């Protein structure tokens, strides 16, 4: 299992996704230039399914993401194209994950002219695909989008700013419900602040309902991740204090001790497989921020807080 898959098991993510989420229609007209088509792949990770978006008002339309490759999505796309007499001329993929890219072969069946047209774009393109450059502009009648490089959820993640609306297609960087998995926390936080600086009002996410207050949602994501950092720092302080009372002058904690302090006692395979990658990432970010440090002992990193014990971090 890769790090991306592991990340979906983290407590923040699963706790948020466990809450009830609203039903979404398979096809929904969100604005005069945006139609959402569900990917037909509902699940714990995908929520109601992957959102794919048809943009534009003319005979040629732009598509953001292609779902996971489900037959139902192909049927919906073919039906919409026939009914409204349009074709997809450009496909923009937010990132490499299969639930966003798996429908590309289905598009070739619906729109055979796409094959060989150099019209499929991704940050790290597959053979026969084209690269996306940060700031690159794509347009069709009625819709103009600008690519915004937002790594963190994945190394290649792109969001797309819709210039005709105060809106942004967020992919998996910000979801309509709950929070997302993160591969690189430091990059993710930078991407959130980059999105926030754009001042968008509406978010069209890769999963879940439309985000009606984008600025508020992004701030909630920033706050959530910062709370987790504070929790780790507080746990380190407590462990250091406890160890020093029993004569351990260094008082540093292993990653495993931190996981147990924060999440409770877990089966070893669960802690190692699901929580260890998350804890490693957050500790490395905090080390770069000089909030924590580590020393090697017995071949392991032992972590300590770089703050005064007389000034403990608030919960």
UniProtKB/Swiss-Prot annotation:
Required co-factors: Zn(2+)
Cofactor remark from the record: Binds 2 Zn(2+) ions per subunit.
Keyword flag Ribonucleoprotein: no
Binding site for Zn(2+) 2: 99-100
CDD domains: LACTB2-like_MBL-fold
PANTHER family for the chain: ATROCHRYSONE CARBOXYL ACP THIOESTERASE, ENDORIBONUCLEASE LACTB2
Domain of life: Eukaryota
SUPFAM superfamilies xref list: Metallo-hydrolase/oxidoreductase (SSF56281)
A molecular function GO annotation: hydrolase activity
Family of the protein in this entry: Belongs to the metallo-beta-lactamase superfamily.
Alphabetized Pfam families for the sequence: Lactamase_B
Active site per UniProt: 99
Catalysed reaction, written as an equation: atrochrysone carboxyl-[ACP] + H2O = atrochrysone carboxylate + holo-[ACP] + H(+)
Free-text tissue specificity from the UniProt record: Endocrocin is specifically produced in conidia.
Enzyme class: hydrolase
Conditions for induction: Expression is positively regulated by the transcription factors brlA and laeA.
Biotech exploitation of the protein: Endocrocin and related anthraquinones compounds have interesting activities for medicinal uses, including anti-inflammatory activity.
Protein name (Swiss-Prot/TrEMBL): Atrochrysone carboxyl ACP thioesterase
InterPro entries reported in the protein's UniProt record: LACTB2-like_MBL-fold, Metallo-B-lactamas, RibonucZ/Hydroxyglut_hydro, Sec-metab_biosynth-thioest, WH-like_DNA-bd_sf
EC numbers: 3.1.2.-
Phenotype on disruption: Abolishes the production of endocrocin.
Residues annotated as binding Zn(2+) 1: 95, 97
Alphabetical GO biological process terms: endocrocin biosynthetic process; secondary metabolite biosynthetic process
